[in-house]
Amino acid sequence: DSKLMTAGVPAIWLGADAVGPERWKAVLDEAREKNWPELALYLQDEPGDQQRIDNAKRLFAKLDQFKKDHPEHRKVRSTTAIGSTGIKALGSQYDIWIAGAGFDESLVKSSKKMNKLLWSYDCNLAPVDAESSRFYFGMWCWKTGIKGSALWAYADPGNTSSTAWDAVLNDVTNTELHYSFVRPMPHALVPPIGWASVRQGIAYHRYLATPPNPPPP
């Protein structure tokens, strides 16, 4: 509804693994009716140990049955933040791999060989580090050929409890948000230089990815 998403760019449905197939159908039906962008189901965050891998397999069994029961949603895609252990165990099942930044060319080749969409995220960039933010969203993403990138968080209070933001809102001036690219102030949310550099990096990426104009006939 906000028009901030465009066709061809999947939106991640965080928390899809917290509900079941009945809710999946309700939300996906709504998405089709209202012509939303594609929703990719986020199933089991960071499956890097056996317990998480086993839970992901349980969720994929549900997803497989869901696609059989509701063929109109048979093309729904799955995703998660994933590393080498998770890819080895489950890479063939996830449609979109969201890998931590810093991976090498072998992962790019593996994703292409397995016909997977490769995205990246980073939680090590600093809001005061303009150069690295610009490089990550610009040259690095273009050079690797990945199709999506993101910071860990625009603003992260540190946990997911219902009261997580209370301390921040009660003292915005003296609260520092870790892994965040915004500074909450009493009058507004103030973006640091790192956030401005993200925008520059995106502009550079667009420039690099745009084919040059052909010479006139």
Language-model regions: role of each:
Residues 1-50, 61-85, 161-217:
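Catalytic domains of carbohydrate-active enzymes that cleave complex glycans
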Residues 46, 54-119, 124:
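Eukaryote-skewed repeat-based solenoidal scaffolds used as protein-protein interaction platforms
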Residues 23-30, 55-63, 107, 136-140:
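A general structural detector for well-ordered alpha-helical segments in enzyme core domains, enriched
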Residues 10-19, 40-53, 94-100, 121-132:
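The substrate-binding groove and active-site-proximal loops of carbohydrate-active enzymes
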